[in-house]
Amino acid sequence: MEILMHEMSNGQETSTVDTKIYTINKQSTKKIENTQIKDEERLMKTDLMDTIDIVFENITYTVSLGCRKGQKEILHGINGRLPAKHLIALMGPSGAGKSTLLNILSGFRTTGVDGNININGHAREINSFRKCSAYITQDDRLEALLTVNENMTVAADLKLPTSTPRYEKEAIIEEILTILGLREHMNTQTGRLSGGQKKRLSIALELVNNPTVMFLDEPTTGLDSLSCTQVINLLKLLARQGRTIICTIHQPSATIFQLFDLVYILSKGECLFHGSTDHLVSYLENIKLPCPVYYNPADYVIELACGEYGEDKISLLVSAAENGKNLQWFKNSNTLLESNGLKTLHSHKNLNINNRNSLQATPVIHQIKILMKRGFLMCKRDTTLTHLRILANIAVGLMLGLVFLESGTDGARVLSNYNLLFSILIHHMMTTMMLTVVTFPMQMNILLKEHFNRWYSLKAFYTALSLVDLPLSIFCCLIFTLLVYFITSQPLEMSRFLMFFSISLLVVLISQGFGLMIGAICNVIPIFVKF
């Protein structure tokens, strides 16, 4: 694994930024050095009673096509066994159902699903299972303005109990980054990392709380061959330490394919093969579909799954695999425990996943504090939007003030005052709402990933988002109110001015809430991407 400990000399250029908010002081460093080795080993390893075997039976998934078109079945009664300490690939052509199955197993998708999913012989309790698992998406959903160390610190503060000492959190971060080969980039902004480094950082963030099961959607997409090998080797190492690692992959090279322990091949929602990668060639020979000499078995089986050799071959493969029930192609298949054996080995008493406390590891107040800290830091580093908001309020305030110049002192211009108030209302509503509608969807992907992986609750995120934006909203509203109020010669009474300002601020805050709602429902980002 030396390749994971050193970066390529010709990698992308990196730069460092100010990290005053998240720094490791000398006292903490001394404590890290004195931390016992046993504690560090405990971080990256799971014992026998913590390992998780996943068994799914007769899984079907249907989607609605509308009132007139009825429903369509995506997965057709598939079965499978995903044992612990294995790196498992869900493989198949586009549209085979790989990502759908991954989402169902992880609990990311629950509606329209039928069948049984058992964890260590017991029926899966979705909220309990989520506490010991992590889901890593295909695209790297990271805060680009934060450094590697800052991202890791936020993850540690949110995912580890508040009783965990700071020096222990720093020891965990340092160990993970060292193992993943990111330690020398701790002070590098995430946006300046290479694709492989971002993928490893995505994995590192979820390793903070040491999950037992990890789901990864297309972890090698967009990476070069060396980065692919680094990522898969890393996943294999994590699996050897006791985790169950499940990832989708489209069409791996022969080298990458051999790194997987088990492969689950799908085609049109059915299982074609379920077993060891070493036994795939033997399986194909056994059903009279031998892989040509010097041919990548992964390429050949994908061609079979696509129907290039006829639809009858797909039916033959599904029949031979018994739609996932046939486990004879596992290594040491005779030693696999049945459901009763798994129940005995992993009793409810010893399973961490049956803890039904809150999904998040920290209280809501602590989550709000950490999210506000992150939000203010990002605002500090990206001042473009802040400057634009201030300039927009100054420009519109001057324009309205000049249009309705001294209308407040002229009794004959009551209608002009009404028009002024209406214009102010429209300005506060539209500028605030449209700004939120456009910018909030950019945060949605990160929100979905972090919330599903139990970093924080939705109420904590909304509260922190509102509080971070509140000082700027007050400042912009105050500037606008001062310009309009005095240029239009409104009555110079403190009570009237405070009432005018308070109502304006309330309109701004309400508009921001509506903007968040509309931005969450109607994601406008794809529209801008098209144009």
Write out the residue ranges for each language-model feature.
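Conserved ABC ATPase signature
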Residues: 189-193
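Topological signature of polytopic alpha-helical transporters
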Residues: 1-79, 84, 93, 119, ...
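Conserved ABC transporter NBD signature motif
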Residues: 80-83, 106-107, 113-125, 129-131
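Conserved catalytic motifs of ABC-family nucleotide-binding domains
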Residues: 127, 140-150, 163-164
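Catalytic Walker B motif of ABC-type/P-loop ATPase nucleotide-binding domains
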Residues: 214-218
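Hydrophobic anchor residue at the start of the ABC signature
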Residues: 203, 231
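ABC ATPase C-loop
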Residues: 206-207
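Membrane-spanning alpha-helical segments of multipass transporters and channels
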Residues: 272, 286-289, 381-531
